[in-house]
Amino acid sequence: MKKLFLIFVAVSPRFTSFAQVNVLDASTIPATLKENAHSVKREEKIDFEVKDIDAARLSVHQVYTVLDAEGNDALDFFEYSTAFRKLEDAEIKVYDAHGKFINKYKLKEMLAEAFDQALVEDGKYYRFRVTAPAYPITVQYDYEVKYKGTLMYPDFDIAEPDQSVESSIYTATVPADIDLRYLSRNINLTPAISTQGKNKIYRWSVTNLPATEDEEGTAQDNSICPQVLIAPNKFSMDDNNGDLTSWKSFGLWYGSLARNANNLSDDTKKRLQTMVSGASNDKEKMKIIYNYLQRNFRYVSIQLGIGGFKPFDAAFVDQKKYGDCKALSNYMQACLSAVGITSYQALIRAEYNSEPVDPAFPKNWFDHVILCVPSNKDTIWLECTSNTTDFGVLGNFTENKKALLITNDGGVLVSTPKSTASENKFNSTTKIVLNDDASGESETDIKTTGEYKQELMHFVMNENKDDQQKYLVSRLGFLQPDELVFTKDLKNDSSEMAFKLAVEKVPEFTAGSKMFLSPRIYKIWSSRIPGDDKRKYDFYFPCPFIKTDTTIYQLPEDYTVENLPRPRDEKFEYGFYKTNYSYNESNNTITTIASLQLNQNVIPAEKYQYIRKFFGGVIEEYTEKIVIRKK
């Protein structure tokens, strides 16, 4: 068997030509590559050739065998095409478990979705999902991309989580006077380097690589999987040449793009100056203009780089009343400048669990733009794309990250602030009147700050009633209501919500004259913490937080308490959980109080077992029951 396998590896460069002799048969995959794998990368050949400082071409050939439904991500084709990165051709071939050809799809058969053409020239997404009638199934992708702009060299993404690799080769050809840099992560891999005329050729090769087991709750996949990051030394983008060997030089290049994009008409400047004329300090001026931006401008969600890096002129945004992240941040910067306030744009990699930027490897890690107003005492950070975020608050989308500040002297890598538990609060108070027939009517008041305020506004203020009800039941864990009535105008104070529920059955169950009630109507924590016995990577919560709940049961007149759960007071390194239960005989009410606090949202892998045990106890406590009975 070993000899057969060695022969197979030797001929793998001609892999696809042997489909007729069943080399694509899933049974030929070595058993070691099926362990912990839901898909296998059978063959991959990536050729990236830099023609000049502003031009390159990418050719990709990939063959995947998907072993089961959990590997279906490998059946998705997704590429974008713009004036800077044109998808010239693509083809998909599908084979069954035995390597028999099933179907073929061309680029014209794929779903094409256009970007906003005002923001992305010739911009389209191309998508295609291969349907698996059975498993295993093999899919082959072949596509060509032409680059007009060379800031973003394609990385060598060797494997996804739960994916093994039979053969993968990445070849990069680059003029020696431009050259490239590389950084291997989660794998010890160095390239073979050769020269051919004026070009340097880098060749990375991987064979028979076992799957990396996925771990829920990690940073994004690229941070745990084998990968080679690749970046140019010199590049051109948006018709501007740049140097990427340092953060300073990268910042100088980006700053040059926006240098002449801060134009506002005299009328607009006067309007802004009048708007802030009553403000007593710069912070008040910033807040007034930020609120103006939120009320009057719309964000178009386009990731930084897809439509280029040059922001649209502030005058364009002022007229159109919309823009992407770089356009709105540039506009806000121009508005602040019009009232005498200096600010700096900052490039950042967004999402609470995005892979951290490596300070030692200058590269375009970034996909978003925010704004920074520096101060010795009180630096203000502004998220210019949100219509709901409070002034000076970033939220978990961009907090606690490395950002590239674009100053007049070039780029400076800085850290954005991080929120504390006390800045992300969720407090609920519910009074429920329980009837003899086990039905009930409840009134709930919810108060939020920080990340929970943003969530509340997103799911409740801006959704229809069915979605609102789904949020209350599925996300917050309230009982399924027969009737839902909001008793507070959400738009008056978006940090609070009040509503009434009519519920046909309040108890978890009844037995004879007894009712068994949950400790509280709102599930203060219900998310499962995955069971990794030997965790390798840090675990990410969306944010640190404080959650409190008070539930008051008004019992039927002829009922009394038989049993209350014992109070809890659980503490661990990163937080605590406390509960208390009391019965007031004079008014026949049960009051339950719970408090849950998490002080840090990134938990080191070596501490994971403690947090899993802690939150497991929180969920377990909810299974305890309040027992009431007829007198």
Question: Across the structure, where does each feature detected by a protein language model lie?
Answer:
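A sensor for short, sequence-defined functional sites
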Residues: 20-631
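Bacterial Sec-dependent N-terminal signal peptides
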Residues: 1-23
